[in-house]
Regions:
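Hydrophobic packing and interface segments
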Residues: 1-662
Length: 662
């Protein structure tokens, strides 16, 4: 059985080779007219410039954390693994974003020349590069680190590296994209009355750049962190559960998931008459079926039974069901979004109130599903089962990220088609692809939250084991634990306040700039004057880089401060409090934002007066409120709860040594 561990790095390399093949495949496609190429170049250069500037700042942060880990816990091997995790997360995000900004224009060109099927294939292939890089780098890194060290504690350093990059990528990307989006919508749509993706809008390029840095690179880093974190927790608990076999099993399951994701990619095929959504679902479901069957076989081989496989299947099924539930609350095909659209007829206030209500209601079923998953997994395999459920949920990350990253590529393709003045038939195709992309993006956010909850819980169990909380448990009547719980419960709200305020400040600057250009550049609204796109890109870039630091530093320092001052028990309370409120708040914000977005699109399809109506203006306001909800604060909370837990796990020896100052 021990030899099976080598499947992990081998399948990781296979995933990276498949990503390379898809990159070449996308690159060979026609990039369209000169105007299309010009617009795509603006988007590509803007995205690359932002990531380069962001990574320069992250180099300093990573270097400081490297020294703190080495000195703080006295283990430089863990510190080196931290560097590797940060490097791999950075590489996955950069490669995925780079290919996405090439796939967008080729998707638009395919829609123009070949129709729906070819456009879907290119957009999905571009997204699949991100997916394969996430699982490729994650599985290869985790596999090699464990093979070389056989030490789960060292492996937590690799996970912390992934988490550190993920937080800044998600927060920075989210602030960037939503500053541009809010500015473009409020001044362009509401004040000037021009359509979305209109080339007359100075913020339109920054908005399309934001799709890539936020929803491709940021989302990929988020799920890379969850993927690695689930493996770390499963390996840590697996050593206790079944020694070497317990540690190897999750790595082999992850390798199986990579194979299943590659197989699933070949099932994503559509035609001119079928729904692209069905094609994407076929790919995801086929990958899930392969993992279910394979996990039963592997469980029998490793443990001579099926209990461990059932824990994995619990996680996998819960992940799929959370995606379905998210679609019901955020898709225009269902009553919740239609209700918000109807409320828009009476103005922005009722639009916002209705969206908040839908978001709050949408927390119930996912939380119940997560609870059922935890109970089921624990019933069959104990605490190890909870970690396996997280591995199971994330086993098909390759195709999950591919489907999620497809969305912003399709959105960009529609923007390029609009700005290039392509015929309405082309925009009809890209609109269909984009509509599906909005739904898959919302489902992806739901999946990311569910996986973050299980991963954080599994890492929390690993932390409890590391500091010896299993023997005595956490005493909820201990004043230190209660203080920790209150502080932990508050942190997701404070974190969200920071990120929402950051978007507000950046959007204010963007709105002022767009208004200035409309007033001072002659003929801009008539299409005769040329907007200054670069100034808007610069505003988003500078704001995102400046504003991402405070939330990021808070996420790292809060658990260290509580652990040092109040001790390991209080820190356990903090992690538990943050997990409970963080998951609820993330679901609420992500689903409210998604519902507002699709209510606006539902009206734009001709309902309740269509584009330009009073209902549409109200829906645009709701969508604008929802933008930082669903693309900045909501997704970033996922990383907050995981990062605080992995920081606690890495620095557990230090907290035990100090034992608290009070």
């Amino acid at each position: 059985m021990e030899r099976l561990i080598y499947f992990a790095p081998v399948l990781g390399i296979c995933a990276l080779l498949f990503a390379f093949y898809l990159t070449k495949k996308v690159g060979k496609q026609d990039a369209g007219t000169d105007r299309m190429k010009e617009i795509a170049a603006f988007i590509h250069e803007g995205a690359r410039a932002f990531l380069t500037a962001e990574y320069k700042i992250l180099v300093v942060i990573v270097a400081v954390l490297f020294v703190l880990i080495g000195i703080g816990i006295g283990n430089w091997v863990t510190a080196v693994c931290f560097l590797v995790g940060a490097l791999f997360s950075t590489a996955a995000g950069y490669i995925g974003m780079n290919v996405a900004t090439k796939a967008n224009v080729r998707t638009a060109a395919a829609a123009k020349d070949s129709g729906m099927n070819k456009a879907l294939s290119i957009a999905f292939s571009g997204g699949a590069v991100m997916g394969m890089c996430v699982v490729g780098f994650g599985l290869f890194g985790a596999g090699v680190v464990y093979i070389l060290t056989k030490n789960p504690d060292v492996l937590s350093g690799f996970s912390l590296g992934a988490s550190s990059i993920a937080l800044f990528a998600r927060v920075g990307g989210g602030i960037y994209t939503k500053a541009a989006d809010v500015g473009a919508d409020l001044v362009g749509k509401v004040e000037a009355g021009i359509p979305e993706d209109d080339p007359r809008n100075p913020a339109v390029i920054a908005y399309n750049v934001g799709d890539n840095v936020g929803d491709v690179a940021g989302m990929g880093a988020d799920l890379f962190e969850s993927y690695v974190g689930s493996l770390v927790s499963a390996i840590t608990l697996g050593v206790v559960y079944a020694k070497e076999s317990g540690a190897i099993f999750p790595l082999v399951i992850a390798a199986l998931g990579v194979l299943a994701s590659v197989i699933g990619c070949f099932f994503v095929k559509g035609d001119e008459n079928s729904s692209p959504h069905k094609a994407l679902k076929y790919g995801s479901y086929s990958a899930a079926i392969v993992v279910m069957i394979g996990s039963l076989i592997l469980s029998k081989m490793f443990f001579n039974g099926f209990k461990e496989a059932i824990a994995i299947i619990f996680g996998l099924v819960v992940g799929l069901l959370i995606g379905v539930i998210t679609e019901i609350y955020t898709s225009g095909d269902y009553r919740f979004v239609k209700k918000i659209a109807q409320q828009s007829e009476t103005g922005p206030a009722t639009t916002v109130i209705s969206g908040i209500a839908v978001g709050m209601q949408s927390t119930a079923v996912p939380i119940i599903l997560i609870a059922i998953g935890i109970i089921g997994a624990y019933s069959f395999s104990g605490l190890y089962g909870i970690a396996l459920a997280a591995v199971g949920m994330l086993s098909t990350t390759g195709i999950t990220v591919a489907v999620d990253a497809y969305g912003p590529i399709a959105d960009n393709a529609g923007g390029i088609a609009e700005m290039s003045g392509l015929p309405s038939e082309v925009r009809n195709i890209t609109d269909k692809l984009d509509a599906v992309g909005n739904t898959t993006a919302a489902m992806g956010k739901g999946f990311a939250i569910g996986s973050a909850a299980l991963t954080a819980l599994a890492l929390f169990v690993s932390y409890a084991q590391a500091v010896g909380l299993f023997e005595e448990g956490i005493n909820l009547l201990d004043y230190k634990v209660i203080v920790g719980m209150f502080v932990g419960g508050m942190l997701p709200f404070l974190f969200s306040a920071f990120t929402m305020d950051s978007v507000s400040k950046a959007a204010y600057k963007m709105i002022e700039e767009v208004r200035r250009q409309f007033k001072t550049i002659p003929g801009i609204l008539e299409g005769k004057g040329k907007p200054d796109y670069k100034s808007c890109v610069a505003i988003s870039t500078q704001a995102a880089l400046k504003e991402m630091l405070l939330p990021g530093v808070m996420a790292v320092l809060a658990p260290v401060f509580i652990g040092v001052v109040l001790g390991p028990d209080a820190l356990g309370g903090l992690l538990g409090g943050a997990l409970v409120t963080g998951v609820m708040l993330a679901i609420f914000m992500s689903n409210s934002g998604g519902a507002w977005d699709n209510a606006k699109k539902y009206i734009e399809d001709g309902h309740h007066g269509g584009k330009g109506s009073e209902a549409h203006r109200a829906a645009v306001v709701g969508d604008t409120v929802g933008d930082p909800f669903k693309d900045t604060s909501g997704p970033s909370i996922n990383i907050l709860i995981k990062l605080m837990t992995i920081v606690s796990l890495v620095f557990a020896p230090l907290f035990l040594k100090i034992g608290g100052l009070f």
